[in-house]
């Protein structure tokens, strides 16, 4: 009788390294060199010596997570959030905020400085509060069959598991005030398995709340939700499998430069209220606007930059890929009696040479693209010959790529500034001015 051979599975061994941290990258990772290879180590600060578990290793670099501190930095701070390390929202609460900011600013300036020999002005970083800055959060909901309770919170880091929370230190106070009340509300819900998630947005006219649910909403639950919205002055939206409906209150809006900008609860808005105001003010100042200017705003959304700048120039045109956002921008212009602005829908990753707006003359351009950048659009827009281009970036890698395109068309980088839009996280926002 033949015996079948079944090879035993190899046990996956955990590789560890000992590293002396020399620097901090903009994402909050400690940087070390071991035998010529660069390692990026999570939860490690400059001057620290750590034992770290390898999570990924490539030919030229490796990733690891500090597990044991053989030498600890005196600058390390105790994370204020009780969920830090489990919740996936923040990555840098153990890093002093000034160290976070300097690492981001250094990364931005060093990358741009490599593109040209001429000096670039590094302007003062645009900063705000380290805590209570987010006006939007999304809370996942999960029915725990064992405890027979609805859990509410954020996803764990690198996982779909839920971390139940009672507060979020980076969220605005108006949002935190609602979280315990939501916990009580959901405990009374008759069909908890139908619950999907909750989105909260702190607006000028109160908190807007979206509840996503599956199936049909029981009348008792609808009454419960409406009473909650009434008592807590919440603008309530309900979303089933097909559509979103405002069932109590009014559409949310925020104020900017004496302008009222209305938006739908699912629309993209800048989540840091104060930093958005500073960012827009900086953009308007750097473009040095006057009443003879004709300005083009790309990826304009619902007019966050377009409408404030339109008040200062002869004419403004905003271009946005999402038609619904274009309609909101038009409505916002009409509500605020701004008549020298036009908005158009266009896919800026496709040729727009036949679009009517592309035939107009623009002497100044502003763009605020997504993380993927604006490579296609810039190749076409540089043909318009604008004297200055202001680029708002949320990704330093695509900023550098796009800056090289602008350089090839004769534009020079004049100045740049880091925007600390999301303290305690790995995100790096910036604003950069190019002149021809």
From Swiss-Prot:
Keywords: 4Fe-4S, Iron, Iron-sulfur, Metal-binding, Methyltransferase, rRNA processing, S-adenosyl-L-methionine, Transferase. Gene3D superfamilies: 2.40.50.1070, Nucleic acid-binding proteins, Vaccinia Virus protein VP39. [4Fe-4S] cluster binds at residues 81, 87, 90, 168. Residues 10-68 form the TRAM domain. Its EC number is 2.1.1.190. The keyword rRNA processing applies. PANTHER family: 23S RRNA (URACIL(1939)-C(5))-METHYLTRANSFERASE RLMD (PTHR11061:SF49), RNA M5U METHYLTRANSFERASE (PTHR11061). This is 23S rRNA (uracil(1939)-C(5))-methyltransferase RlmD.
């Amino acid at each position: 009788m033949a015996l079948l051979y079944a090879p035993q599975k190899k046990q996956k061994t955990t590789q560890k390294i000992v590293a002396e941290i020399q620097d901090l990258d903009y994402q909050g990772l400690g940087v070390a060199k071991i035998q010529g290879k660069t390692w990026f180590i999570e939860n490690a600060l400059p001057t620290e010596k750590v034992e770290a578990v390898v999570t990924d290793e490539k030919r030229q670099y490796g990733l690891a997570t500090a597990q044991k501190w053989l030498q600890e930095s005196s600058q390390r701070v105790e994370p204020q959030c009780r969920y830090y390390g489990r919740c996936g929202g923040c990555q840098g609460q153990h890093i002093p905020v000034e160290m976070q900011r300097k690492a981001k600013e250094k990364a931005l300036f060093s990358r741009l400085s490599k593109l040209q020999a001429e000096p670039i002005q590094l302007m003062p970083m645009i900063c705000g509060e380290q805590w209570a800055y987010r006006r939007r959060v999304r809370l996942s909901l999960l029915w725990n069959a064992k405890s027979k309770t609805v859990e509410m919170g954020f996803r764990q880091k690198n996982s779909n598991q839920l971390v139940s929370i009672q507060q979020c230190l980076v969220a605005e106070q108006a949002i935190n005030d609602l979280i315990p009340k939501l916990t009580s509300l959901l405990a009374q819900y008759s069909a908890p398995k139908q619950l999907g998630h909750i989105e909260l947005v702190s607006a000028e006219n109160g908190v807007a709340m979206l509840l996503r649910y599956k199936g049909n909403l029981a009348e008792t639950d609808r009454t419960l939700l409406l009473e909650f919205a009434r008592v807590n002055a919440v603008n309530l939206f309900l979303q089933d499998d097909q559509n979103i409906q405002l069932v109590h209150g009014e559409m949310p809006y925020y104020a900017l430069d004496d302008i009222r900008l209305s938006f739908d609860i699912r629309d993209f808005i800048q989540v840091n209220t104060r930093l958005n105001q500073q960012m827009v003010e900086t953009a308007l100042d750097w473009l040095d606007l006057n009443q003879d200017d004709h300005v083009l705003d790309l990826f304009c959304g619902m007019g966050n930059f377009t409408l404030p700048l339109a008040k200062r120039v002869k004419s403004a045109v905003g271009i946005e890929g999402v038609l619904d956002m274009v309609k909101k921008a038009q409505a916002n212009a009409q509500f605020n009696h701004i008549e020298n602005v036009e908005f158009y829908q266009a896919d800026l990753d496709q040729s727009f040479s036949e679009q009517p707006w592309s035939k107009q003359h623009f002497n100044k351009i502003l763009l605020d693209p997504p993380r993927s950048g604006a490579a296609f659009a810039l190749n076409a827009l540089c043909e318009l010959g604008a004297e200055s281009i202001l680029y708002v970036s949320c990704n330093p890698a695509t900023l550098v790529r796009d800056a090289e395109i602008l350089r090839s068309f004769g534009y020079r980088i004049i100045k740049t500034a880091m925007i600390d839009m999301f303290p305690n996280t790995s995100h790096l926002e910036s604003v950069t001015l190019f002149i021809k």
